[in-house]
Amino acid sequence: MSEHIVNVTDASFEQDVLKADGPVLVDYWAEWCGPCKMIAPVLDEVARDYQGKLKVCKLNIDENQDTPPKYGVRGIPTLMLFKDGNVEATKVGALSKSQLAAFLDANI
């Protein structure tokens, strides 16, 4: 994983995501999820490309089972963009880099 991506947990979610300055993209994922593995390199690139404009976080749903239901996560990968502690936009499924960039550019 990229040094530009922060692993968050149920315990750190409030501090790392909800209280963050600026927009935060959260990737809800699991080790066994094929599409989650496909999107991982795309997230690494986006984390580098948007450094300073966007914080990118990953939350493993198997290890952190309290947070996903609070935000209605039903399928993975789910990408949620948070601003000022609120969900601004959500995408479910693996996206290409251009699809993810378009999603981010429209919402940050």
From Swiss-Prot:
The keyword DNA-binding does not apply. It comes from Pseudomonas aeruginosa (strain ATCC 15692 / DSM 22644 / CIP 104116 / JCM 14847 / LMG 12228 / 1C / PRS 101 / PAO1). GO terms for cellular component: cytoplasm; cytosol. The gene is trxA. Participates in various redox reactions through the reversible oxidation of its active center dithiol to a disulfide and catalyzes dithiol-disulfide exchange reactions. GO terms for biological process: cell redox homeostasis. Residues 2-108 form the Thioredoxin domain. Belongs to the thioredoxin family. The lineage of its organism: Bacteria, Pseudomonadati, Pseudomonadota, Gammaproteobacteria, Pseudomonadales. Pfam families: Thioredoxin. It comes from the Bacteria. GO terms for molecular function: protein-disulfide reductase activity. Keywords: Disulfide bond, Electron transport, Redox-active center, Transport. InterPro entries: Thioredoxin, Thioredoxin-like_sf, Thioredoxin_CS, Thioredoxin_domain. This is Thioredoxin. Disulfide bonds join 33-36.
